[in-house]
């Protein structure tokens, strides 16, 4: 027994396992250093306990990600002795995989206030080129990873004592070793012998839920969310007394010609009433925190004035559906909450027919505008299958203005793009049909680029979202100044909100509720909305 413990202590396998745990602990330290500002204050005892529990939560990662290393070390035999570089290469590949994912999330968690899971892969897709600004902004981290990789390659122990498995000379011993290895890996994958495999959500049973992201790791979150289980099928049918048949609610709304004031967009009301244009303006990363009516530092003087206008309804308690732009479209236009571990737009259910605003807008021209690549986040394909008639992306932007108005990263700056949106509204408003259109801005997104004439002149830290929110507010002011001169303006209802929130320097806006608070304004320049409210709405 003593010789066994001595072998384990000196074994290269043991040294490599300990090195793997050390790397994950190092990643956790870096992640905490960068994200401590949004985590609740914790004592030194809680901090140490979180790291100790974190080692336990690293077991599935070490077992799964480093599996090729352990197979090679134990069963490599003579090839292992002849080609020690393979051991180094396998270990380095596994180590850099964990470090890279943890490194990416070290910065991204500052925006989402949580660990990212398998949705990271969905976010890449055809938008992988958009990672360039993140990489450039974190070039020091990239160089640090490269230096660490070289250091690891130099110190990874590959010579010395290894488990000797001889299937030819000692087949029974080899079989027992293989079974023991498989059993150990299985227990490692599950994180123990408990009834259910260890998942990131289990961290809340060891520490306070608010600091659970410190205990877990991004590789574990990816492992926990990679399996995409199907959802149960439901058929919600309604027995309508007027015809005595079972019809889907949406079918009834669209086919029945009886006037229904609660759904003014669904059909003509008669009596000479003119259906208004409906315009949704979704501002990237617009949180209530950045507005004057959010009791924060006001970066939105125009929106603040608009919220106080008698023709505006301001809703003080509204919440974004998630923390990523890709979650906005199905939520805002289809009423689809983010209850899956993946994005609805990229899920197997994206092609399902769902009730949506464009479908209910009977008799309306429908259009969606976004100044980025046409395929970004799958918006174009998803919206077109909902029944949207027109999608306007960067491909539809005037070629002669592209070079002047491109921000160098995501797409067209907000100010010129909103002016372009007005020109398109002029075309859409031909007097034959009302228009239901939405425009999604993009300037208030990392890397927070604004046009040169505004640089150094706006409030807020240029390295954060704040000064780009101030720019977006200016773009909105100029949008309404121009739009107010158009013949379609008075007969248009504008809905202004944010797709999600972003950074904050206030503790409340990193709470479970505050982190999702976005402003919602409904502005109708031609109608005093407060006099036409339906009770209870």
Regions found by a protein language model. Give the residues of each.
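Transmembrane and membrane-interface helices of multi-pass
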Residues: 2-231
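Soluble catalytic regions of membrane-associated enzymes that act on cell-envelope
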Residues: 194-537
């Amino acid at each position: 027994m003593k010789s066994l413990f001595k072998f384990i202590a000196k074994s290269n396998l043991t040294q490599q396992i300990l090195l793997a745990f050390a790397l994950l602990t190092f990643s956790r330290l870096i992640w905490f250093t960068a994200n401590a500002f949004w985590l609740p204050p914790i004592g030194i005892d809680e901090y140490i306990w979180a790291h100790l529990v974190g080692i336990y939560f690293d077991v599935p990662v070490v077992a799964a990600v480093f599996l090729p290393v352990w197979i090679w070390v134990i069963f490599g035999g003579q090839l292992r002795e002849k080609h020690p570089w393979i051991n180094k290469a396998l270990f380095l590949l596994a180590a850099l995989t964990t470090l890279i994912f943890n490194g990416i999330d070290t910065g991204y968690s500052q925006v989402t206030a949580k660990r990212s899971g398998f949705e990271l892969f969905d976010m890449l897709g055809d938008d992988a080129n958009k990672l360039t600004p993140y990489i450039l902004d974190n070039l020091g981290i990239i160089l640090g990873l490269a230096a660490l990789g070289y250091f690891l390659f130099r110190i990874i122990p590959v010579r010395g004592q290894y488990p000797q498995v001889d299937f030819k000379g000692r087949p029974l011993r080899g079989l027992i070793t293989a079974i023991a290895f498989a059993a150990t890996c299985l227990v490692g994958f599950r994180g123990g012998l408990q009834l259910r495999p260890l998942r990131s959500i289990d961290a809340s049973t060891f520490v306070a839920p608010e600091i659970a992201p410190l205990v877990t790791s991004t590789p574990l979150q990816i492992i926990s969310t990679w399996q995409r289980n199907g959802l149960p099928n439901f058929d919600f049918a309604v027995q309508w007394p007027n015809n005595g048949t079972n019809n889907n609610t949406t079918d009834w709304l669209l086919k029945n010609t009886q006037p229904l004031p609660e759904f003014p967009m669904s059909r003509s009301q008669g009596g000479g009433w003119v259906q208004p244009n409906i315009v949704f303006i979704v501002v990237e990363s617009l949180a209530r925190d950045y507005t004057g009516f959010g009791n924060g530092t006001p970066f939105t003087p125009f929106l603040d004035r608009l919220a106080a206008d008698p023709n505006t309804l301001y809703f003080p308690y509204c919440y974004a559906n998630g923390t990523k732009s890709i979650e906005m479209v199905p939520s805002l236009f289809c009423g689809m909450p983010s209850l899956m571990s993946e994005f609805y737009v990229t899920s197997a259910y994206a092609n399902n027919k769902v009730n949506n605003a464009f479908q209910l807008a009977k008799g309306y021209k429908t259009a969606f505008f976004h100044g980025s690549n046409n395929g970004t986040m799958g918006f174009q394909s998803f919206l077109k299958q909902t029944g949207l008639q027109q999608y306007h992306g960067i491909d539809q932007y005037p070629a002669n203005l592209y070079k002047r108005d491109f921000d160098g990263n995501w797409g067209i700056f907000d100010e010129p793009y909103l002016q372009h949106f007005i020109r398109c509204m002029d075309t859409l408003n031909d007097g034959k049909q009302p228009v239901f259109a939405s425009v999604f801005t993009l300037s208030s997104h990392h890397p927070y680029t604004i046009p040169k004439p505004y640089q150094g002149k706006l409030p807020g830290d240029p390295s954060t979202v704040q000064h780009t929110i101030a720019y977006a507010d200016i773009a909105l002011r100029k949008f309404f100044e121009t739009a107010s001169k158009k013949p379609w303006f008075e007969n248009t209802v504008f809905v202004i909100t944010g797709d999600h929130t972003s950074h904050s320097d206030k503790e409340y806006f990193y709470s479970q509720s505050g982190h999702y608070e976005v402003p919602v304004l409904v502005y109708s320049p031609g109608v005093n909305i407060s006099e036409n409210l339906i009770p209870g709405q």
